[in-house]
């Protein structure tokens, strides 16, 4: 059975593309839809784990990522 791990995906629209970013590994990908961007990010993360050395994985891995929203007065 393959080992699995849960990662965060932050997806933003940029022009006609959707950019997906994984903050735990600082890896990003893109797609023409949210679904495609998410799929491409999953592929990029899987490829990273297939080819990166254990030390590179340890250096890039952020163990704690907090995603939150804030209310800021703007005017």
What is the predicted role of each segment?
Residues 15, 25-26, 56-57:
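Amphipathic alpha-helical interaction segments
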Residues 25-34:
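A short, exposed loop/beta-hairpin motif centered on an aromatic-Gly-Thr core
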Residues 1-10, 39-75:
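Short, charged, surface-exposed hinge/linker loops at domain edges
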Residues 5-22:
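Short aromatic-glycine-(Arg/Gly/Cys) micro-motifs in beta-strand/loop hairpins
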């Amino acid at each position: 059975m393959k080992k699995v791990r849960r990662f965060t995906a932050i997806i933003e629209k940029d022009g006609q593309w959707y950019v997906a970013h994984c903050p735990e590994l600082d890896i990003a990908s893109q797609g023409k839809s949210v679904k495609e961007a998410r799929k491409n990010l999953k592929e990029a993360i899987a490829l990273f784990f297939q080819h990166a050395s254990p030390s590179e994985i340890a250096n890039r891995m952020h163990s704690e990522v907090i995603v939150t929203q804030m209310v800021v007065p703007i005017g």
